[in-house]
């Protein structure tokens, strides 16, 4: 990579752009959903916070995948191969499978932002549980995936 923008700056700009675009789309979707389902707009700051932190975690995951593969087609394929099964794992309720299998599913789901984002949005939209825990979890995942993306760029720059 050459140019006036640092690698970290480029990753931060891409993450910010992806986060802003994602939040705008999600706010429009929730507004459309409110035509059919009652939404408590008094909780708007809470679900906006959940959307922003969740979108940032997903943006960082996308940046890490892109930095690890360095090819657009491979990154897209890897993103779909990873994300579709992981999204289903986030939706598995506790009584649907054996307890040992559910513990494995919880451990795998904790490494990716799907389940924490679902928990954060559920807490923000429906007042269902604690919002702080999922937001901290998503923030940690955003930092971890951002660092992974940055380290991946450094590794490829050396070769």
Residue ranges and their predicted role:
Residues 28, 60-61, 85, 117, ...:
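Hydrophobic/aromatic residues in alpha-helical transmembrane segments
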Residues 32, 36, 65, 69, ...:
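Hydrophobic alpha-helical interface/terminus motif in multipass membrane transporters
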Residues 96-135:
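Short hydrophobic, aromatic-rich alpha-helical segments embedded in or entering the lipid bilayer
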Residues 69-111:
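Transmembrane helix segments
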Residues 1, 19-30, 76-94, 155:
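Hydrophobic alpha-helical transmembrane segments
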């Amino acid at each position: 990579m050459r140019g006036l923008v640092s690698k970290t700056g480029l990753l931060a700009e891409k993450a910010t752009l992806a986060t802003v675009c994602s939040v705008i789309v999600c706010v429009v979707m929730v507004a459309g959903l409110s035509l059919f389902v009652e939404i408590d707009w008094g909780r708007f700051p809470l679900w906006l916070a959940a959307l922003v932190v969740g979108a940032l975690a997903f943006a960082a995951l996308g940046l890490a995948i892109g930095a690890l593969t360095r090819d657009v087609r491979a990154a897209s394929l890897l993103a779909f191969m990873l994300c579709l099964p992981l999204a289903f794992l986030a939706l598995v309720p506790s009584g649907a499978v054996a307890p040992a299998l559910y513990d494995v599913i919880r451990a795998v789901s904790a490494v990716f932002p799907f389940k924490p984002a679902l928990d954060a949005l559920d807490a923000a939209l429906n007042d269902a549980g604690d919002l702080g825990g999922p937001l901290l979890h998503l923030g940690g995942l955003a930092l971890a995936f951002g660092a992974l993306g940055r380290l991946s760029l450094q590794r490829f720059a050396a070769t």
